[in-house]
Amino acid sequence: MSGKKILIVGASGLVGTAAVKLFAGQPDWDVVAVSRRAPFVPLGKATHIPVDLLNADQCREVFGAMGDVTHIAYCAVNEQEGNMVAGWQDPVQAGKNMAMLRNLFDPLIAVAKDFRHISLVHGLKAYGSHIWDRVMPIPFKESLPRIPHENFYYHQEDYVSAKQAGQDWSWTIFRPAMIAGDAVGSNMNSYLVLAIFAALRKEAGLPLPQPTGASMVTDVADADLIARGLEWATEAPKARNDSFNIMNGDVFSLHDAFPIVADSLKMELGAKEDFQIIPELEKLLHLWPGMVRKYGLRAPENLKELFGESLEVGGAWTAPIAPTDVVRYGLASTIKIRQAGFHHCIDTADMIRKYMRRYQELGVIPPVA
């Protein structure tokens, strides 16, 4: 035993998947991955335990027996099926997410006598980025006051802060924007939506069109980079009991992704068109089951298993944006985390190329001929 055992919660999601890969690849960590379904990517040396975090009895049985856990990377979130965006301000949905954390942590902290740290992955909704009629500050900074509204991020932060008072262990909260990763079936993987759309267009013999109009300019967060942040927080003194924005380090115009994807998949880049990506993708979805069989893909034929609720956020690639709004919703300062000692970064264009390659390597989309 290394003496360091991390519980990665929400292991089948974007950040959880990346965290499992990172920690399981290191010799000094024992890794337990927790999620209702197994991660799509190989687990390596990690052990997967299927748990429903809303089942308090199951959680008491499972986590009450984990006295050797020293660290937690909490990446889990429960989204409202069928109307994910509406759920972001729903008190019932907030209550579910608070219950999930409590169901896990209460029994675990009672038995984990060498517990050292918990990280929680939140996001820019901590600043009200999902409340569309607000005037947004630019950039979002960790010092901004809370927005009076129903937000489980606040409940979870207050909970771990109260639990930690007077204890030797510590907590860290991360706030990324628009996460990119290689999880399949995740609820927030807009990059998978774009990749599948491009693959369908290529299979149909069609070019990848480019959106017209103004493009949102936003921060992006690579799930692999967030996993590095989770690793950093396990040991960094300046990460203790604090919150940090975490981003790639540049800003990105969403429409610029289309030529990058076309080049990555060796397909024709079309002209600029007035279109919406989700309706156009749905017109071609009848091709998908045949593509899975034709190319021997590991990706599921079932659309719910493939996308989760990601189609709801995937429309952002072509969403009409008023020119005055292009920088309103997704720009955050990363000065605080840099000054605290975390300096990892990645060019977002390179990140997109990486995931287009990785989707092929994992058998999510057809390989480039």
Label each residue range with its predicted role:
Residues 122, 159-188:
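Conserved beta-loop-beta element that borders a ligand/cofactor-binding pocket
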Residues 167, 179-196, 224, 232-244:
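Glycine/proline-rich active-site loop of Rossmann-fold NAD(P)-dependent oxidoreductases
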Residues 145-149, 177-190, 211-224, 250:
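Glycine-rich "substrate-gating" loop/helix at the edge of Rossmann-like oxidoreductase active sites
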Residues 39-103:
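NAD(P)H-binding glycine-rich loop region in Rossmannoid oxidoreductase-like domains
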